[in-house]
Amino acid sequence: MENRIFIRMVGAMLLLCVVFTAFHGSERRIRTTIDDAFKYAVEKDFQNRKLYLTRNAASNIRYGVRDYALSPSFDRKIVNYSLRTPTGIHTYQFKDSISEETAKRFLTQHLLEKVHRLNPNHVKKLFLERLEEKEIDAQVGVLCLRDTVRHWSDADSVVPKNVYSTPRQVLDITGKIKVQAWADYSVGTV
């Protein structure tokens, strides 16, 4: 009799371990999908704002912004990037060498912020669309930090407790513009 009870207990513990492992793996996959969906939304917003430069007349765009944002980048590593402005030449120095394409993306984000700012509501909409494509049902919010000023999607600064927050992404060359999202998904999604 004791042998049967022991076997049932071991079986139950093994079943619990399998269920826990499957649940934990599913949650990790969902969080990875949420991170990827947010990166996609930020990238798509960047491309949409960059497209804004090509559609507007040069008189609407500040000095040199269009030239820098739309010029090609080369496949090489750089340690600094120079920008000509009406007040002179500004040089941005990097700690390590980075690809010119990455530096150009950071610079373009910085310049776009002056003519067509990132809108957390638009990023949130793109984020939700991507999550729906991936069949993840969640409440989400987006935070954009400009220096120390916080801009929330839907002007809502209340984040529910126990939600998943994506890693904060630095967008511009100065490191002053950052975005982050949170997602509150149900256990049924896992």
Give the positions of each predicted feature:
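Membrane-interface helix-start motif
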Residues: 1, 184-190
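Single-pass alpha-helical transmembrane signal-anchor segments
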Residues: 13-20, 190
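N-terminal signal-anchor/signal peptide hydrophobic helix marking the start
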Residues: 1-16
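Signal peptide cleavage region of secreted peptide precursors
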Residues: 23-26
